[in-house]
Amino acid sequence: MAEDRPQQPQLDMPLVLDQGLTRQMRLRVESLKQRGEKRQDGEKLLQPAESVYRLNFTQQQRLQFERWNVVLDKPGKVTITGTSQNWTPDLTNLMTRQLLDPTAIFWRKEDSDAIDWNEADALEFGERLSDLAKIRKVMYFLVTFGEGVEPANLKASVVFNQL
């Protein structure tokens, strides 16, 4: 018999494509190429299949990670990497040391509607978000698209229980 305790209220916080920041990072790559310069030591340059997403913490305290909500409307793969960067891209570049482990990887196979994921890492990453929410209003993510998927094919959010 299931317990009859009330279910905790939940918050579903979407990951939103930050087009301005993605564009700014792409311009950085183009600028370096045009001037024939190299990236700073340890700098993470945005690759063509990567985009920057943000999560606005509408609540920062008393959150407990519940689950990822990821929908891919076609087969492919996305890797979501958190960053420790509090971004002011006109002043600071993203450095590789600011990329957080573990990453969350989600994929959809050709003949399936179901989303698979690297469950242990995705759960550990999600649990870290509850802690990071306490000290941030916004968190940035680097999302890498693979196997034919692009930003238009992804809908992602993080669901938290409100304690």
From Swiss-Prot:
Q: Report any one BP term from Gene Ontology.
A: sensory perception of smell
Which UniProt keywords are present, listed alphabetically? Acetylation, Cytoplasm, Olfaction, Sensory transduction
Keyword Nucleus applies: no
- Primary localization class, coarse: cytoplasm
Looking up InterPro entries in the UniProt record yields:
Olfactory_marker, Olfactory_marker_sf
Instruction: Fetch the Pfam families from UniProt.
Output: Olfactory_mark
This protein's GO CC annotations = axon; cytosol; neuronal cell body; nucleus; synapse
**Keyword Ribonucleoprotein among record annotations:** no
Q: Tell me where in this chain the PTM N-acetylalanine is found.
A: 2
What compartments host this protein? Cytoplasm
Family of this protein: Belongs to the olfactory marker protein family.
Oligomeric form and interacting partners: Interacts with BEX1 and BEX2.
Q: What does this protein do?
A: May act as a modulator of the olfactory signal-transduction cascade.
What name does this protein carry?
Olfactory marker protein
Q: What is the lineage of its organism?
A: Eukaryota, Metazoa, Chordata, Craniata, Vertebrata
| Gene transcribed to yield this protein | OMP
